[in-house]
Swiss-Prot record:
On the 2D-gel the determined pI of this protein is: 5.5, its MW is: 16.4 kDa. This is Autoantigenic sperm protein 4. It comes from Vulpes vulpes.
Length: 15
């Protein structure tokens, strides 16, 4: 990605 909210959301996803 281009460093969007989805990228961080899945990377910081607790599960």
């Amino acid at each position: 990605x281009x460093y969007q909210t989805d990228e961080l959301a899945r990377v910081l996803s607790p599960t």
